[in-house]
Structure formats: C-alpha cells, structure tokens
C-alpha cells in the first residue's frame, strides 16, 4: 500500500530540480547557478567600475568573443527611467556613422535594465589633464573637424545632442584601429527635433527647463529657449575655446546660491564679447562663434562651411592631419599603470521633471587638480540619469566642480542588488589584458604585448 506513495514522493524529488533548471535556462538574464551574473546569453557581468544617478557601470565580457564591454545597469523601478530611451536613440543613429560606440544588447538583468556597449578609451577631459590643461591649435582643429562631422550625423538622424562637454567625447582604446577617432557617447539628454509623426521641426518655445552643462551650453539655453541644432554647435564652440584657453571667463564665479551662480554664468557668457573670448587666437574661432550664434532656431547649419573654416586654417598653418594629438607620446594612465602611446597612432533635467537646487554628493574625480579648479563651482541642473557608460562624468563634472542638481532618486544600486555579491568576481582575462580593481578610467586596459599600429591618414 505504501509503494504508490513512495513513487509519488520520488517523482516530486526528481521533477522539482528539473523544473528549476528549465526555469534557469529560459531566463534571458540574471544570476546563474554558479552565482555569475549574466546579461543576455553571453555577457558576463564583472566588477563595478563606476556609478552615477542612473545606477552602476560594470565591466563585462563577451564569453563568445572574449572581448571586454561596458554594461550599464539601471533599476527597473527607477522613478526616472532613462536607459531604454538612450538605447532607442543609439538604434536610431545606427552603426553606419563613424565615432559612435557599438551597442550590443539591451534587456532585463534581474531587477535592472542593462545596456551592453563597446568599451572605449579615455575622454578628452582625461587627455586635457594629461596635457597640462591646454591643447595646441593643431589638436583642437583635429578635434573640431571630427566633432562637426559627428554632430552633423547626429542631426541628420533627427536628433539634437544637448550634452556637449569634454567628458562625452572619447578616443578609442589603445591598440585598436579606431584609437585616433573621437567618439561621441551618452545620448541620455538627446531629443528628437523633428516630430516623428508630422515630420516637422519642433516649435520654438521659451521658459524651458535647462538641459546641458552650464560651462558649455549656449546663451539661448541660459535664457530658457528651446534648443535646436544651433545650440549644439555653439556649445561645441565654447568647448573648443576651453581647450585653447585652458579655462573660460565664466568659470569660478562666486554667488550665495546655486541659482545665483547659474545666473552669473549666463550673464558673464552674454557679456563676454566674442572678440575677447577668442583674443590671441585665429580669427576663424571668432567667425565660428559669430556664425552659430546668428543661426535661426529652425535653420539648418552649413556644416561644410564651418568645417572648411577649420580645414583651411589647418592647411594655412602647414599642419598634417596625422592624428598626432598632443597626448601622443605621453604615458596614458590605465587601470594597471601607464601605456606609452606610439607616436605613429594614437545635466540636467528633462522638461518633464522639476528642477531642484540639491547638490550631488558625488566626489570630484580628479584629486590632483589645482585648488583653484577644485574651488570652482557651476550649476549643472540634474538630468534624469547620469548616463555616461565609460568614464569621467559618472561623478560630478570634474575640475570645474559642477554641481548636479538631482531631480531623480535613482541613486546607487541597493545593497541587496543581484550584482552586489559578485562585484569583485574575477573575469577570466585574455592573455593580453589585465584588469585591476581600482580603475581611474574604465575605458581602456594595458596590453602586455604592445601592437604596432600604423598612422591613420
């Protein structure tokens, strides 16, 4: 009489583990039975290499190709979800444009959304530090010519960028054929300026909430005007002068409140004549700023005219476009020391969220900057998420000490997050790659066997 009961118990004991295994195999992302966190079928999540308002940035590895990747994790229950929108913009941009990171995967990972992207090199801000915070005219022109093409491509896909700053422009990884290419990253603040339904330009509006980084944003953005293509180009012009001068006249302003300081930045920017800003530099720099500031809200910029301004100046100076940037030949810091570069190659808030003057508690990244630079503060109204997946702007805007006014509560990941127990789990390194725990920049790695690279023409 007891045999049927024993057989039933035995079936229950054997079928339960099998059901659990089927559940695990059908799960697209999450922790495996060995405790390894996976994103999608083939991306293994490793140590934490950065964090920001969006959540965490993790080092990852493609188990099929042994290539390292960057993985952004955002809580699914975030009050201001951002990652899927950024992924959609990357898909809208496509893979045809030069200087855009590859996006490998987007999907759930336990309690988080995850986006897997190409791992790139250091940012222009990192390299600016390396070059004693001044770039030569040749380097700035090589950067400017490339970034005008990047922005033209972004605009051709019906997007405006709205987040110009040196931290968002990265070179490729050392030893990679794209190491000389300036990449544009982080489309968390981008916006469609062509209505996808009507195919018409968005209307001109005023009293808009501020979007961008105060140091570089256009004058019209300070005035609360809706941004369009012209504002991206003006912000680029301010960044070019930052590289040439080493600083901008509206840095380091004093005020009692963040709101007043932000107002002072805009006032100083408006009251600084272009001739003064560009004094002692080629006239083409002033011509560029005059042109972009005179553009109409709806007007399509003449990108070729602006590029020709710089290419003609480049040729008149007798420069060769050999990608011999100022940082070439300098030891570039990596997570495992320095790599000597072969001389042969080389935010704010969305409109739907209210602005709150609450500074971020994130530390400044660069601990070696001068005390004067550390003492400078700018208001950087918060974006929904701090969406850089590679390097510098995971923390507050460095050197200038920009304060992020946070309007979302994403914060860091909870202590009980599924990756927390495995953040230090080693990733089996390729023979040529080493990874250490304390990484100043998460975008590049020291190669043990130095590969010779040819100069890119």
Swiss-Prot record:
Modified residues (Phosphoserine): 343
Transmembrane stretches, start-end: none
Domain Protein kinase positions: 43-314
Entry keywords, A to Z: ATP-binding, Cytoplasm, Kinase, Nucleotide-binding, Phosphoprotein, Serine/threonine-protein kinase, Transferase, Wnt signaling pathway
Top-level taxon in the UniProt lineage: Eukaryota
Bias (Basic and acidic residues): 1-13, 350-359
Mod. after translation: Autophosphorylated.
Binding-site list for ATP: 49-57, 72
UniProt-annotated stretches for the region Disordered: 1-36, 350-384
InterPro entries for this protein: Casein_kinase-1_gamma_C, CK1_Ser-Thr_kinase, Kinase-like_dom_sf, Prot_kinase_dom, Protein_kinase_ATP_BS, Ser/Thr_kinase_AS
UniProt subunit comment: Monomer.
Protein name: Casein kinase I isoform gamma-1
Phylogenetic lineage: Eukaryota, Metazoa, Chordata, Craniata, Vertebrata
UniProt gene name: CSNK1G1
